[in-house]
Amino acid sequence: MKKVLVFVLLFSLVSFSPLHAESQNDDAPVKMGEIVVTATRDIQEIRKAPSNVTVITAEEINDTGATTVVEVLDKLESLQFRTYSGNSSQSQLDMRGFGGDNPFGKTLILLDGRRLNRTDMASINWLQTPVNTIERIEIVRGSGSVLYGDAAIGGVINIITRKGTDKPKFNASVLAGSYGLNDERVGVTGATGHWTYAVTGENNFNSGYRDRSKYSAQGGGFDVGYAANDLLNVSLGVSFNKTDYQMPGALTKEQMEQDRRQYQPALPAYFMNAHPDDDGSDKYTNVNLGFKSFWGAWGQMEINFLYGKKDLQMNMPSWSSYNYSDTNADTYGITPKYILAKEIFGFHNKVIVGVDFYNEPYKKDIFSDRERTKQLSAAEFTRESMGCYLRDEFNLLKNLIFSAGYRFERASIKGSNLDFLTPSNNFTDQKNTYNAEAYEAGLTWLVDKQSKVFAKYSTVYRIPFIDEVASFSGFGGNFLTGLEKEKGISVEAGAEFYPLENLKLGLTLFRVDMEDEIEYVYNPVTFTGKNQNTGKTRHDGAEVSLSYLWPKYLKVFGNYTYHTATFEDGANNKKEMPLVPKHMANAGMEVYLPFNLTLRPEIHYVSDSFLSGDNDNSTEKLESHTLLNIYLNYKPTFGNLNLTAFLGVDNIADVKYSSFGIDYAQYGMPNFYYPMPGITYKAGLSFTF
């Protein structure tokens, strides 16, 4: 840690020293197309990135009537969400077929560049970032291990919050809908002199489609920026959120036929309890202090000091008396980087070099009662990592870009467990260290003014979660010193073409081969199990997208995704991985009607997939489903007042479906499913001035 602080201090002194600085204004402004930050960790035109990239703006989010980030992302190619409760509070993301039984560490989620992924084996809470705080969301499909390291396998999603610009703007909205949905938002952004500011707040509540599936989320944030001069910018962003949620449990098919909206009843024949009291409460705080120093022809330096805090309370008496837990997880990060764009022999070249340091203390206490009067165990761990990366882009020709990069990362997990009931589960000061490398090389051919063709080869890796390495949650205690990281190779190629000015066609093909994937292996003889590096898997896929704009009349859009994910060795060789649908498709149109009205019908299709745990593909599948949605927007303008009125109906046909199911047939029990909401109505009103 001391070495890191010394490095950062020296880096900062050099970064913000004016001795070699030249005014940023010395460079003539360059006109760019649609830009993205996540693909290269710097401002970059989307079409120059060797990746399939999507950017969603705040205006697009507002037009959809979405109340959560999950609702925004779920209609994009290669993205699918599953949930245990029918709402967004416990959603799990499948990106590029990396769903399976452990999707948590296969897609990297960022908030303004800071990692949101948890260090334990659990999904992030997607409600921790209110949609009112979001300026844009950038989705970069495919490997990002060189630039971001651990977990950037299926892709990287960066949620970028609002920043102040220009004159002050005030916005507010209210939305209500079925199952007790109500959502209220307010915000103000602006700039004055050298200062910029943005303040937002949101309240989101839903009683839930099922009994015991209620959630409420309150959050907000602010961002303050100061441009000291042409050489230095300073920014401070802070966000917070509190989410309370219930967990209704799963149902058998017979129970769903009786009442698909009930919480899970008891099944004494299978020693399964009812779920009338399962719930949780999460609190999140995120802080990002950033400095940018512009050196003109000598490039620019950036450094961010990051802090995140998670206080998570979980109550699951339906499982056992061991399932009252408090988890406290902090994140301390320092991420300096240097960027230099310079011509070499008349050809454009840009190099980025940086360091990502994270220190993440983790503490979990388990109790025997909701009041936390009797503690059963206490576990404390620290995950620390430092990754150094280098990436370069060089124009071989004016319209042909070669990119290459390398990353080395060292991560350690160390900690102790104290079990007050079973001392044999105790361990002290155990430690694992992981060394990881990633490489990438890509080519991007710029065709005409808008189109591109690209190809990319890269390696990927994932460091084990704390609770994959250590067992400390009331089911034994051990520390697996031999558990290795997951690693793999990713290859992709694609194109985006504009055969007409307003017609965009996209196609991306990819393959990811993984090895040493971590799986819990159960021994039926000893009735025990542990996590092991079990073998190889393959993920093949294709992503197709289309959009066409007929100005003043309509916009047509659609996408299709093909996935196949298979085990490539062992007893289940060539069997399909669970919870990966082969086909997903979305289509819709915006019809621009008179009187500032816009009608948007949509269709959403997901094919069947094998149930969780069905590695040998021996039981029934999770059924396919097709959903129809329709929305109507009214957007008049009264001087400086911009108004949007919104009406929407999701799942018009009231389709009965589930997004998640578990194979219990292998244990002689019925399979279990998590029902999703039926037909849902919602309406809202927003204004900006």
PLM features: what roles do these ranges have?
Residues H194-W195, Q300-M316, I366, T444-P464, ...:
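Membrane-embedded beta-barrel scaffold of Gram-negative outer-membrane proteins
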Residues V69-V72, Q92-R96, T107-L110, N125-P130, ...:
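N-terminal periplasmic accessory domains that precede
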Residues R114-R141, G482:
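Short acidic/polar hinge/loop motifs at secondary-structure boundaries
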Residues F7, Y226-A228, S239, L390-D392, ...:
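Conserved C-terminal beta-signal and adjacent last beta-strands/turns
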Residues F345, L397, F402, R410, ...:
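Gram-negative outer-membrane beta-barrel transporters
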Residues D230-N241, G280-T422, T428-D429, L446, ...:
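Face-selective signature of the C-terminal outer-membrane beta-barrel domain
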Residues A176-F205, R210-G249, D278-G296, L340, ...:
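Transmembrane beta-barrel wall of Gram-negative outer-membrane proteins
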Residues A250, Q255, N359-S368, R410-P423, ...:
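Surface-exposed extracellular loop regions of Gram-negative outer-membrane beta-barrel proteins
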